[in-house]
Amino acid sequence: LAHTRLDVGGAFGKTKEAPYLAMNPNALVPTLEEEDGFILWESNTIVRYLAAKHDKAGALEPKDLKARAIASQWMDWQLSVVGPAITPVFWGLIRTPVEKRDMAAIKAGIEKTTAAMQMLEAQLARPPFVAGDAFSYGDIPVGCMCYGFRHPVPDRPAMPNMDRWYAAISARKPFHDAIGGIPLT
């Protein structure tokens, strides 16, 4: 999709400034603003919206109600289970200087994230993607969390199903350009 990316949040700041807060009172990223002034925040909501609006072929939003529910289930799992587990890992290993790291919190986060990823590993033993035989919007946010787990976590257990799936989604140019090809910072 044609878009303009504005770097906001983290080292770029701006999320606490009045213009941004008017769009997203949470002061978090991402925020989608369309040319007509429509504003939407929350990552998974934005993914679902863009798929519904632009994916006329139905390649991202499963047409089958049950497959669509499974895709949404994994999106919500990413948000409610993986996100809280991986946050101390990401912040601890990527954003915190070595001398200031809380290794106990990082270790606990790695254990929780690993347990969650083992659920994904089991799911991917059956279909090739989280919601079935085809890539869907459910794979996008889960893939983002996998990227955050695979790269900084030392000595993670073997997860061949997840590795196969991650290789498949990473081979997709949009995923590579937006996620996999960008260093964690």
Question: Residue ranges of each PLM-predicted region?
Answer:
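GST-like fold's C-terminal all-alpha helical module
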Residues: 63-66, 74-171
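Active-site-flanking alpha-helical
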Residues: 51, 145-146, 179
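Short, solvent-exposed turn/loop segments enriched in Gly/Ser/Thr/Pro and often Arg
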Residues: 9, 137, 182
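Phosphate-coordinating loops and pocket residues in cytosolic domains that bind phosphorylated ligands
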Residues: 22, 62, 171, 180-181
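Terminal-tail/helix-coil boundary detector
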Residues: 175-185
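GST-like domain detector, emphasizing the conserved glutathione-binding G-site
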Residues: 1-107, 111
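Residue-level recognition of oxygen-bearing side chains
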Residues: 45, 161, 174
